[in-house]
Amino acid sequence: MTSRKGLSCCILDPTGNITALVEGDVPVSRQPETAARIMRLRPETEQVGFVRMRGADPAEESVKDTEGQNGAPGSGIQVRLRMAGGEFCGNASMSAAALYLYRMGADHSAKSTVTEEPSASDAWTNVFLEVSGAEEPVEVRLREIPAAGPTWSARVKMPKATGIEPFEDMTLVRMQGISHIIIEEGSRFFHLKNDKSAAEAAVREWCGRLSADGLGLMFLERAEAAQRWKMTPLVFVPGSGTVFWENSCASGTAATGMCFSARSGKREELALQEPGGELQVLSDPTTGETWLSGTVRLTEEFAL
């Protein structure tokens, strides 16, 4: 594999939540301004992350950690991802894992077959990432979708909630690196969904009150199809100063699954229709695991 010099930027589409990933050394102090530049170049971008990959450059024996320090060669981490605001992002984790496979030329040396889908054609590749805001390595499972260009089905094992509690007449799900407020139709705050300026003011105020690394407002309502929900995500990240009505929000989807499973005390599997498409979440309070499922597509690459 040839070595790439300088900075490159890849644009990926995980269920409409357009994500830019920068490869190369960018000091943490310069990441917000680099992210702002990319968002000016590609206004459809909703978030920017910075990645280092083990083995993507033949000369690279280890990858720097999310704060720019040298990582241990034997750590087992294949990708390190730091978001521009230092928050955790599930869709960016999915995107970084997909980009890693793309860079490695779909070398399936890390392949493991998911037990519930044992046939060879259903083999998934596991990628382990260190992600800003997450205390433990994040596992992503990917399977390439044939004849769809560089596109993958993906599953992310989401970090556990650190707390689920009432907030006004809503539910607050505290997570590593970001928190989410689930706003259901019966809430007196649900009207904020149709008052964008008031909603954006509220998410900033509540984020400060909660001292959160980032805060999402997840407006949740029943969809027409049975057992399906419609969700409209608004996310504020103080570290990058961004407020976005996102096309999809992976961590917000996971938070909704965690909220429902904590409420029912049993395994919950939900399909959430979001502006950019559908995400699925499976949350099991018995095992404590929450898995998010979606797709990710590589759409563009350019030099910075």
Give residue ranges: language-model regions.
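Short, cationic low-complexity segments
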Residues: 169-185
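Extended low-complexity acidic/polar segments
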Residues: 158-161, 171
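C-terminal binding/interaction regions
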Residues: 161-163, 292
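Membrane helix-loop-helix hairpins that form the core translocation module of multi-pass transporters
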Residues: 151-159
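A glycine-rich beta-to-alpha transition motif near the start of alpha/beta enzyme domains, typified by
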Residues: 1-152, 181-304
